[in-house]
Amino acid sequence: MKVIGLLFSFVFFAIKCKSETIEVYNDLIQKLEKLESLSVDGLELFQKSQVIINATQPTETIDPFTNHNFAQQVQDFVTKFEGLGFTEQTELVNLIKALTPNRYGVKYLIESKEEFNGLMHAINFYYDVLRDKLNDMCANNYCEIPEHLKISEEETEMLKKVILGYRKPIENIQDDIEKLEIYIERNKETVAALNALIAEETKKIQPEGNEDCNDASCDSDKYNKKKPIYQAMYNVIFYKKQLAEIQKVVEVLEKRVSTLKKNDAIKPLWQQIEVLNAAPVVTAETQIVTGGQSSTEPGSGGSSASGTSSSGQASAGTGVEQANTVASVTVTPSVGQNGEASTNPQTAQVQPVPTLTLEEKQKKIAGLYAQIKEIAKTIKFNLEGIFVDPIELEYFKKEKKKESCNLSTSSCKKNKASETIIPLTIRYPNGISYPLPENDVYNKIANNAAETTYGDLTHPDNTPLTGDLATNEQARKDLIKAIKKKIKAEEKKLETLKTNYDNKLTEFNQQKTPFKEAAKEFYESKFRNKLTSEIFEKFKTKRDEYMTKKTELNTCEYGNTKELINKLNKQLNYLQDYSLRKDIISNEIEYFSNKKKELQYNINRLAEAVQAKQNVLVASKDVPLSTLVELQIQKSLLTKQIEQLNKTEVSLNKAQLKDKLYVPKTYGNEGKPEPYYLIAVKKEVDRLAQFIPKIESMIAKEKERMEQGPAITGESEEVPSGPSAESSTDRSTQSSTSSSSSSSSTPAAAESSSATLPEAPAPAEAASPSTEASEETTIPPTTQETQPSQAASSTTPAKPVMTKLYYLEKLQKFLVFSYSCHKYVLLQNSTINKDALSKYALTSEEDKIRTLKRCSELDVLLAIQNNMPTMYSLYESIVDGLQNIYTELYEKEMMYHIYKLKDENPSIKSLLVKAGVIEPEPVAAPTPVTPAATEQQQQQATPDVQSDAPAPSDVSQQPETPVTSTTPEVTTSTEASSSAPGEGTPSGEAGASGTEGATASNAATPAGTSASGSAASNASTTSDVTPPAAAAAVPSTSTPAPAQPPAANSQSGNPDSGIRSRAESEEDMPADDFELDNLYKSYLQQIDGNNTEFINFIKSKKELIKALTPEKVNQLYLEIAHLKELSEHYYDRYSTYKLKLERLYNKHEQIQLTNRQIRDLSILKARLLKRKQTLNGVFYILNGYVNFFNKRREAEKQYVDNALKNTDMLLKYYKARTKYFTSEAVPLKTLSKASLDRESNYLKIEKFRAYSRLELRLKKNINLGKERISYVSGGLHHVFEEFKELIKDKDYTGKKNPDNAPEVTNAFEQYKELLPKGVTVSTPAVAVTTTLAADAPATPEGAVPGAVPGAVPGAVPGAVPGAVPGSGTDTRVAGSSVDDNEDDDIYQIASGQSEDAPEKDILSEFTNESLYVYTKRLGSTYKSLKKHMLREFSTIKEDMTNGLNNKSQKRNDFLEVLSHELDLFKDLSTNKYVIRNPYQLLDNDKKDKQIVNLKYATKGINEDIETTTDGIKFFNKMVELYNTQLAAVKEQIATIEAETNDTNKEEKKKYIPILEDLKGLYETVIGQAEEYSEELQNRLDNYKNEKAEFEILTKNLEKYIQIDEKLDEFVEHAENNKHIASIALNNLNKSGLVGEGESKKILAKMLNMDGMDLLGVDPKHVCVDTRDIPKNAGCFRDDNGTEEWRCLLGYKKGEGNTCVENNNPTCDINNGGCDPTASCQNAESTENSKKIICTCKEPTPNAYYEGVFCSSSSFMGLSILLIITLIVFNIF
């Protein structure tokens, strides 16, 4: 199907989030104001006489020799324009600036006028284009357009005609190849003519004679000579501008023609035209008719052409470049994918054309051209390439987009026209928050601005704020005083400023209307070329007055002062509120901090006990089972304690966030401006509203088509079109990916069966055969995890369902949900005027869809989520909302507790009296006797008040009482909350105050009631000391419904929630369940009665507190519960948005980093390829050294090949990494710390795999480096031996090849120990030279005598230019391209030795060229070998270091991924393990996995140890061999110094610089080798330590597994091991580390037994004093304290205190082992052995250890609470 592949890409053509920041708007306004000023000033300065129709000609022109002001005015004017940055006019501006200082130049400019007119044309053009841009930007009153910058419709239309009409001729012929070619040829002629004109004008420009004219010597003759030069300078600029435009046109049109001719459908048609043009023309009588063709038909091409034409017309609008396949039926019956013609031989064959008459020929050609034109219409032509000016190009794109909207079937234009435009100030009564620029957002995220700054808080004196403002109370008080002082000072000025402002505003408004009229008249007359001097002067006057008044109004301080006072008041209110709630927050932080310390202390004690037992068990051969049980219980408790610690850490983080001093942008009752993210959401809603009808229309047409044409099958539609719509897929690849991710993450419970299929595969399968862009889209692991689990098991066949209609319907469902969701988010959070917002009200169907899929802010499109400014707006809105919630929650909590305590606590009553809330009590009068009836009435009234605080037991006994018919609104709200709990809570509700506001809030927010209900449930069931929470639980029948009924309803769906909180102990209780009511109560009870701040707070709430009644208190409690839930909701959003922003920031950083890696690797690859080419060059080498250089060259070739392969691998890896980050999307709905950790692990594994592929070649390169060092070392040895021969005989010229072979062999043998294993040195032979010479070209002229006539490579990686291994100083490398930049040492290639320092000339003594020919050639060879040695030595060090580092990094990444399973045991705040050895807490499967992976890591360490050891051995051997050679060099120097013959000594001393240099080389290499060997030794020690740690950990894990296996055996035989469990419980109770109830719960869960079974030995019957209890025995403590141990059944007492197995137990002996009071019975067991059954009788009916002991007391003597706890634990 042609459309399906493009469907999901086309969907999001309009769904893109565009950020227009306030900076963009301000910059545009500033630029336009400058352009407006230049336009008016320029008309006055340059064009007055040209534009104004009745302008009087000046009596005399401006004379630059007498008028010195004009030149300065021009300079200032041009400088202002240059500052605007319009680069296309740079040459013209520079010309005017160059001519203005010269009086001749000024005179020319005045006379010519062309330069000024050109500049003014550009200014007016930019002014109009940018005014039009501002007009579009501020459409629908999105922003305000200043009066003097508005543009009329006439001007807009004219601008469109000028820019679009100028390119219209090209658009008219863009599909006609014939006309395009003619047009191209004509423009090429124009290009040639312009080039000739430019060359001609350039010749006229003479550099001489450009001096200025400043005296009387200036005359007209000199000016007449200069004028043609000035004119030529302008002409060159003018012609170049035209040339650039025409060349762009030619380039674009040639590309267009080439694209059309290469098209698979057009190509055969074009071939037919060429054949027809070349065919002869005859008369009609002689024409030949082809076989099988009617004589009346013009030809096969003609008939097929007509069919093709209609086919092309039918499919013209289906895609951007789909027409590549259309019309190919002319010669091919079918077309393959991507527009490639079928391989049928008939398709590639152009049939022979019959000879036609001229008329027939022309008609046939015209028909073919018509077909081509129809096909070309469907192939996209990008006209944007012809534009030179970017401002003009931007306008063209904008207008073309508008045209496409107007031409489409959508109602975008109609909707805009019919929409009632509401002014911006009315639409957004509180204004708009514009987004921050992206770079500012990145900086804020990098610096964690929300947590490291004080928000919108500044010191009134503009001094820096202290860093301890949150903790330093005095600093806050000082700041509050300073703010109050500043407010008073500013308010004093405000009245005067207000009067001044009103006066200036009145004056400005008075000038506004006259200016508008004058401006309208001016621009209209100028537009119609009817501008008169009167109109212009009037406009100038009114404009000057208007701009003056506008400037005065803008500079008025009233507005700024008022804003400053509002800001200061906001800061003051916040600081005062913060100071009030600071004590409560501090207490909360202290509570959770203490709880954390307590947990950490318990964890440390448990961890030490666990480790001690673990060590004992590891070291012991015989492990007591009771100790195993104790260990397992402690480990289980340790895990739970760590979980509890992390929960407490989360609660502590929440409390610390409350403690964060952060002044929001809006606070309290201040009007909140519309957040930018809601503006983005509104745009998406508007776009979806336009797009959904189009999809519905497509669905209707598709259904109609399927009904009309049932014969059309999916197979016919599977024939894909030509090259797919690359433009649409490129625009929306990420959006389509995001659509699938978003849609797949929203379950549709009520959809049809087809709707349950995953959304993601649909676009992927559809787009894969047609677009490259979609193939490159990578779906990350985090996105894959959002797919429904049932996707893989779907039974619906894929092919029958994958139809165009199926796709359209799925798309429509997703868009409808997205539309409903975005509308809901907008409705819940927007501050838009109600009338404007009513347009977006949800229909009943939309609300149903939204409710079923539980829409929230997390469902916004990825285009919004992945936009940094928009996402930061979401985050900032949540941060501000949290601060408001914290304050409101404090106020309501305080009022609630004040009301509750006012009658109980005298100090509270005293505070209320001081604040004037209640009247002081009158003096007590004698109490009269109360009649019985009155007392009875009081008793009846008392429950109405006291029922607000019932006992927890009362609550549990009356769960259904509040659910009555008197509370329908609450019940309804509760039912609604079940569908969307807390997802769409409006942020504005957090600011509601008062009971009336809360009622409205709860009515609008279903989640509020459910949230408060759960809070009340927790309050009433978790603690006996929470009267405030329980107070509203059971109200009187006359009160509104409290929080309890929703809690009851919510518990019915999840019975765990209420019961578990009762059953758990305080240690096991989640930290979040701790009720903070006691903090408020304690604070109020301890507050100082003279606390003026708190008294002022009570005064501010005086009326609200007075109005409180029991009913309103219940309502207040509901509001508090709702705010608590809302704060949790906001905190979750805060954490998620923060993670998202950090994710986007890290993604941005990773993309930049990876791009740098790709750039560096690309440079490295280019240099390696260049080096590879160099290695194949031609070199001339001194005879006798061919083998050294040849072997080194061969090793170098392999080295470069390996490096290239590794570089290609790394490039592939980093490109895939970049692709992953750019295409991957992390939806908010699935974003979490865990998902980011999984992503991080995925990336580490990918890096691990990439590095693993490099290892083998890195190892090979190290070995190749050893080879090269060995060969170069041999060459140096041979050089030294040759110099020794020269010292003996200065006439020595070297040995011939046969005689030289043994010496070469000896040189190789000297350093063969440096070769890697498996590499041997082949003995050089005479044939070596012969072979080289055979393949070599003839020795070129000028070759040095004695050189080997062969091409012997000698270049190395990093060879320095000039370092030529030749046979003489004049010998050069032939055909080499040596890389002269060797500083890039990325991964494989090491940098060479720095050659910046000047090199000492060691051959300076040998001045006679003819006498020392061989010496100088040998010296050059030595220089080359020396450079090779230094470079090879540096390279092998770098390769070895990089190889070891890569493996270490790979191993570390592997271990980090491995340790991910231990994250549960990390402290959230420090990211460190809570205990030292977290491995012991893993289960067996994970331990096995850890062992396998640790063994793999150990294997890697062994390889590193082997590599390092081999490296140490190599460098030590290198030092040893070089020391021997160094000693020989020193000896030779000493021999020369000791020479007695003066003549010989002077001759030999010439060689001392060479020998000293060789000595220095050896000393340098030896020193560096020893240093690196020591470094490798340190690495080796570290590797051994690391290996030892891994081995110890592996052994410990194996021991842990053995212990766990024994424990598993114990669990399997739990029924027989109850006594062991009892012993373990007893020991644990004695230790004090584990509570009695806690240990039994853990043991019950571990043994999978009923908790009561573990009470076989009650704690009071557990032995305390008896220590030496043998194995297979049980100990019992009587009620009187007597302790006794007895052997268990099946065992008997042996020698000493032991119990041995009893193979034949009988009741006759020792009562069979039963208690003496018990009855004993013999029974046959399944193993044909006897078994004893003991039965305890009254008065001791309770059996212990299967009747070995009998007692009168049983488990029923235990605490009833413990029994209930165990029962509940086993049930749930």
From Swiss-Prot:
GO cellular component: extracellular region; plasma membrane; side of membrane
Lipidation (GPI-anchor amidated serine): 1751
Topological category with respect to the lipid bilayer: Lipid-anchor; GPI-anchor
A molecular-function term among this protein's GO annotations: RNA polymerase II complex binding
Domain of life: Eukaryota
Residue positions assigned to the propeptide: 1752-1772
Subcellular location: Cell membrane; Secreted
Pfam families (alphabetical): EGF_MSP1_1 (PF12946), MSP1_C (PF07462)
UniProt key word Magnesium: no
Post-translational modification, as annotated: The p230 precursor is cleaved by SUB1 prior to merozoite egress into 4 subunits p83, p30, p38, and p42 which remain non-covalently associated. In a second processing step during erythrocyte invasion, p42 is cleaved by SUB2 into p33 and p19; the latter remains attached to the merozoite surface via its GPI-anchor and stays on the surface during the subsequent ring stage.
GO terms of biological process kind: mRNA 3'-end processing
UniProt keyword annotations, A-Z: Cell membrane, Disulfide bond, EGF-like domain, Glycoprotein, GPI-anchor, Lipoprotein, Malaria, Membrane, Merozoite, Repeat, Secreted, Signal
Glycosylation site residues: 54, 406, 646, 829, 1018, 1090, 1408, 1446, 1541, 1629, 1680
Function per UniProt: During the asexual blood stage, involved in merozoite egress from host erythrocytes possibly via its interaction with the host cytoskeleton protein spectrin resulting in the destabilization of the host cytoskeleton and thus leading to erythrocyte cell membrane rupture. Involved in the binding to host erythrocytes and is required for host erythrocyte invasion.
Name assigned to this protein: Merozoite surface protein 1
Source organism: Plasmodium yoelii yoelii
